[in-house]
Regions:
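Cell-envelope/extracellular polymer assembly enzymes that use nucleotide-activated donors
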Residues: 20-22
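Short, well-formed alpha-helical segments that are part of the catalytic scaffolds
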Residues: 24-43
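Acidic helix N-cap motif at the loop->helix transition within catalytic regions
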Residues: 33-35, 56-65, 106-107
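A conserved acidic beta->alpha catalytic loop
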Residues: 40, 51-61, 74, 98
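Conserved donor nucleotide-binding strand/loop of the catalytic core
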Residues: 59-88
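Catalytic-site signature of metal-activated, phosphate-bearing donor transferases
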Residues: 79-86, 93, 104-265
Length: 265
């Protein structure tokens, strides 16, 4: 059972030019992460958790931490879930987080300053990826710049799985980092592996894309070569090799699923 205390959220009272920041966190069975994620976002005026019918203590921990929790079925569409969150707050500025991410103090201070100045811009932030306790510097993990902080009325999300924020505002770099604890257990890794490869195959199938068996055979070795050699995964040691091999398997799995989906048509 989780227990602990949380710092109070930032007090905006008394400011003449009040600009509210909302932090949006999508969750599904994230009891191991949600507490630390919310603690890192204590600079915000509001923290909103959009929960996909978690079966663990995610909702209870989030509510105890001071977040507003809304249950809303994901239905395999991450972009739609993020766009739904836009309708659930009146905040002027939005920061989107994943439950396994943490905001550095420097980034939080920068966002408070930006919200007070209220420029017409969107902000990308550097993400530091940590897999199984190891900070990842190569293998496609850097540079990892995420467009996450922007005025509420200036963004829409697109994409079923690896969704992207779309905005017409100029994009600037935000000082500070997000720390992304991307994988903490192999069970969690393979849960996401299966979920994401299925969703990506479904998205491509729905878009009318096809896959030859030659692609099933040839793309995985190239995916490994790109990750391990071209992107420097070899410099990450044993974990770099393991993740490179699984990256190839990930590539194969999504194309195998697409191949057999189209075979049923």
């Amino acid at each position: 059972m989780w227990g602990g205390s949380f710092p109070a959220m930032h007090d905006w009272s008394g400011k003449e030019d009040f600009v509210k920041i909302a932090v949006i966190i999508l969750t599904h069975n994230e009891e191991a992460h949600i507490g630390a994620c919310i603690r890192s976002a204590a600079f915000a005026d509001e923290i909103l958790v959009i929960d996909d019918e978690s079966e663990d203590l995610t909702r209870e921990i989030a509510a105890e931490a001071g977040a507003r929790v809304i249950s809303h079925l994901l239905a395999g569409d991450f972009a739609a879930q993020r766009n739904f969150a836009l309708t659930q707050t009146t905040a002027d500025w939005m920061l989107y987080l994943d439950a396994d991410e943490r905001v550095s103090p420097a980034a939080g201070e920068t966002m408070r300053r930006i919200a007070e100045e209220n420029p017409k811009a969107a902000y990308e932030i550097k993400r530091v990826n940590i897999a199984f306790g190891q900070k990842m510097r190569y293998g496609g993990h850097r540079p990892d710049l995420c467009l996450r902080f922007f005025p509420r009325d200036a963004v829409r999300w697109e994409g079923l799985v690896h969704e992207r924020a779309r905005t017409e505002l100029p994009v600037r770099r935000l000082a500070g980092e997000l720390y992304h604890y991307t994988y903490t257990s192999w069970d969690r890794y393979f849960q996401k592996f299966n979920q994401y490869t299925t969703l990506m195959a479904q998205r491509q199938h729905a878009a009318g894309k096809t896959c030859s068996f030659a692609k099933v055979l040839l793309d995985p070795p190239f995916a490994f070569f790109r990750f391990y050699i071209l992107q420097g995964g070899i410099l990450e040691g044993r974990l770099g090799f393991v993740l490179g091999a699984f990256h190839a398997f990930y590539t194969m799995a999504k194309y195998v699923k697409l191949y057999y989906m189209q075979a049923k048509d």
